[in-house]
Amino acid sequence: MMKLAKILLLFFCLLGQQTTKAQKMYQWELFPSYHNALKTVCSKEKVYALCNGNLLSYKTADQEVYRYDKTNLLNGFKISFIKYNKTVDKLIIVYADGNIDLMTDNETVVNIPQYKNKLINNKEIYGVNITGKYAYLATGFGIVVLDMQQNIIENTYILDFKVNATAIYNNKVYAATERGIYFAELDKNLMDKKSWQNLSGHYFTELMVFDNILFGNNTRASLFVLNEKNKTFDATDFKLINAWQITDGMMMAANSQNIYIFKNANEWNTIKQNNALQDIDYKNGVFWGASGYEGLKPYRINSDNQMEAVGEAIIPNSPVRDYANFINFAGNRLLVVGGNLNYNGVNYEGTVMYYDDNKWTNFQDGQAISDKTGLPYINTVNIAQDPRDENHHFVTSARLGMYEFLNGEMVRHYTCDNSRINSILPFDVERKKYVSTSGAMYDNQNNMWFINNQVDTIINVIKADGSWVKIYDEKIKGYPTFDFIMMDRKGRVWLNSRRHSQGIYMLDFNGTIEDTSDDESYFRASITNQDGKTYAPFGFYCMTEDQNGEIWIGTDVGLFVISNPDEFKNNNFVYTQIKVPRNDGTNYADYLLNNTNVTCIAVDGANRKWIGTTNGVYLVSADGMETIHHFTMENSPLISNSINSIAINHDNGQVMIATDKGLVAYNNDAAKPQESMEKSNVKAYPNPVKPEYNGYITIKGLTQNSCVKITSSNGQLIHEGVSNGGIYTWNGRNKQGKRVASGAYSVMATTENGKESVVTKIIIIR
């Protein structure tokens, strides 16, 4: 009894002191965007919304919002369609890759991967029609019939051309295709192409049956109705319909000005609206609108016969978009920009945001900035946070100059006409659309460095006092694709030229920004390794300095290391290409990640390397000799194998991964080590450990390679090991692999040299 009382006393003492957020070690977290609501459907208990291809639900009874992703219930990502089948009370979730989930309101999910796994090139599904217990899927080759009650694919009808939509009407299957409208009798052999007849040449993206009439919709034209007598479709006066739904015995059709609510095919009410609804549904007297970036909104018809919002928009705190091309930590704040240098001609909406204290803050966006500048706001590529003011940021862009933000609002747009930035086409009337800026960083003197591409002077510095310095170097004059800029521990500046005049550039300015007379610089376009093997990479994609001062380089032909940056200027300089022994008795070794497209590299608290590629993420040991993990879409919750950027929170070890589909986090077991062992820094979490918890217990705030011993209250050694950087993890088990009993356990952490140690307590309750 006394022992239990002591444990409870320690429990309440620790509860009062506990300030560290419990982070589940080795777990994944996704950060989907829920800002752009495009589709909505209602079930008996919930309203579902599809936002940027991500799913959420709103439970009207208790106003609970639930987010679904690959780490909880779903079996995929990037959803194309959702439809609710009231006959079987299931939601069908169709993914962009052809995968299918069926989900009930009580959140039981059945995955149907058969269509995704078919050996066909185009697996996209273009439309879903619900009739009875069936879902008819319009595909790139025909129609797939899914029995939603039995959770099986029942039939496949191959037409050999793209189908946009389907409908069942008067014992016939209708298909809106790229070649017009086709139909077939339901009692015929629908797998026989001869059973299908062409009805008309109309092009529709949607088909629906209402009031025993078949409707077709072309969002660029009008709603049409089938004239069976003439075997054609007749246009109606309802034009540019972009939201269309049938529910509770009524049909709703909306464009940018009106919502038409049909009681039957010949009787309707016209509701004025200016909400730009993307989709609409109805439940218990409330219209639910997918209102784009205004979120999921509830509406009612007011006395003026207008749609009026009757509640707050449902927009969970999240990134504004699933764009994450470059990420970086400033302290514990994750900075994110979406966009790229536009090599492939794709323009991404300007996207700048940060994640801090479990909350997303999205900067001023889109049209508001374009209205101020008179220019498009696209392809933001890099960001630097002012060390003197965490609310002050500079953001570079691929072609439209540089933006300065204060408290998330743009306060200045730097162009070739109002600053010392230069244009690629200085004499062109459209010169402000050809101002290429990239890589941005602050040095330890609060000077902001950035790149101005494809002009005579590439390197620019806005000094701490606001004055501007341009550092000219003939070697790199006019180079078009410098990407990132970084400063090593000796104050040298490094740039990677991604492609077109690609290579690695180093500038040693000897600490004198304005005096270029003592500068030394070097540019290397090719790579020769320690074995004399020479490479000419098409792309130099990334560079990072590790804890030993080595610089790791990622290219399209693999991974290389500048082992001693002091030697980069030497004529006989060679890169190190890490060789991993095969250990098969042959004495042979293989180059680490040879011929792998290495896109980004980050260094964790244990000096291990997190390497992003076009085939997932690798975690390798500090020296690269051991591959600890290779995470892919196939073996983890990673949402894409195409990795853009990786950043690590050195306080808690969390690894943030930016992919071409959005952001993912992995709770890593290595954080930046402390300089000295201080009791105030050493914390364990979760603490206390409650009965339902089965995960790892984390001890943080340690020095490099700390020796950790965990003992019971009677002094028995339960567990021991060495920290990864500043973190040590324990699975709550003894040396025999059994879960330890309730009690107070002592954690003794000692520095690598044995001179300093601290003791903390962990309370475990079983």
Where are these regions (language model features)?
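Bacterial Sec-dependent N-terminal signal peptides
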Residues: 1-27, 766
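Carboxylate-rich, polar loop motifs that coordinate divalent cations or form catalytic acidic clusters
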Residues: 22-682, 717
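Short, surface-exposed loop/turn motifs with a glycine/proline- and acidic-biased composition
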Residues: 70, 723-754
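Residue-level recognition of strand-loop junctions within catalytic nucleotide-signaling folds
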Residues: 668, 700-702, 750
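Glycine-centered coil/turn sites that cap beta-strands in beta-rich domains
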Residues: 676-709, 727-730
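Short, glycine-anchored, charge-dense loop/turn motifs used at functional sites
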Residues: 707-718, 745
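Edge beta-strands of extracellular beta-sandwich domains
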Residues: 757-762
